[in-house]
Amino acid sequence: ETYAIDRFEKSGALYDIKITILKDRVTVTLDTTGPSLHKRGYRQNSVAAPIKETLAAAMVSLSFWKAGRVLVDPCCGSGTIPIEAAMMGRNMAPGIGCRFAAEDWEAIAPSLWKEERKRAFEAVDWDSPLKIYAYDIDKKAIEAAMENAAEAGVADDIRFCRADSAKLCLSGQLTDMNKSGDKDKEGGIIITNPPYGERIGDKESIDRLYAGFRTFLKENPTWSMFAITPDKAVEELIFERPADRRRKLFNGRLEVCYYQYHGQKPKE
């Protein structure tokens, strides 16, 4: 009535207002982000039951891995774990490729966003040597992982290969990284989200994969393995002893455990 119009036309930036009510308390907030922060923006393609980017990053952070040390994901799926590792190794800000809802708001000067994004790009370390290897038996998974790595800007930092990881482990080829003999004196790191639940195949294939891991770890005692799974049998079937550490986590709504097997310190 004040403006003598029926409705206001939509114009300008979008302000996503969220209202929550708990008993007698009302909270009104503005969403400055847009899509959830666990979405880095690089995952354009995925396979069944992909692991969240934030969970993959946490798995890498809780391991012994650092830039320059060999990291292998033998069940890489759409590549989330190796991609997150590569981004951490390059010191890339998690949301470096994202655009946020508040960037269109007049209250925040565009120059501030530009300056912060510039600082984030300047902080990227392109010189650290990265030895990251990702395998999967599924051709479509490898193709998706390679596309996602390219979108994240780390395509050249990860060596992807379609392969049967059980066979690689049993043949010892996980340590024979390439023709130049790219090995790690400290012992490599396996970080993986093996098949289970929606991702599980037939029991025989899973048993064969576990047997491959078990054989590889026996033959390479300085290697460490970090695996997330709801399958409590992994301690017996892979490690043949209790894990050095366990952490209860959630992969989506599924309760899982992050099993940490620490390899022996290499002899001087």
Residue ranges of model-derived segments:
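Non-catalytic, mostly N-terminal accessory regions of nucleic-acid modification and defense proteins
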Residues: 1-53, 60
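Residue-level recognition of the N-termini of beta-strands and the immediately preceding loop/turn
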Residues: 13-15, 128-132, 157-158, 188, ...
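Short loop/turn motifs enriched for small/polar and acidic residues
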Residues: 20-22, 77, 163, 230
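Beta-sheet entry/capping signal
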Residues: 25-27, 68-71, 131, 189, ...
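Alpha-helix capping and helix-loop boundary segments enriched in small/acidic/polar residues
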Residues: 46-50, 76, 250
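Conserved S-adenosyl-L-methionine
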Residues: 51-168, 198-199, 205
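C-terminal catalytic and target-recognition region of SAM-dependent MTase-like enzymes
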Residues: 164-167, 171-268
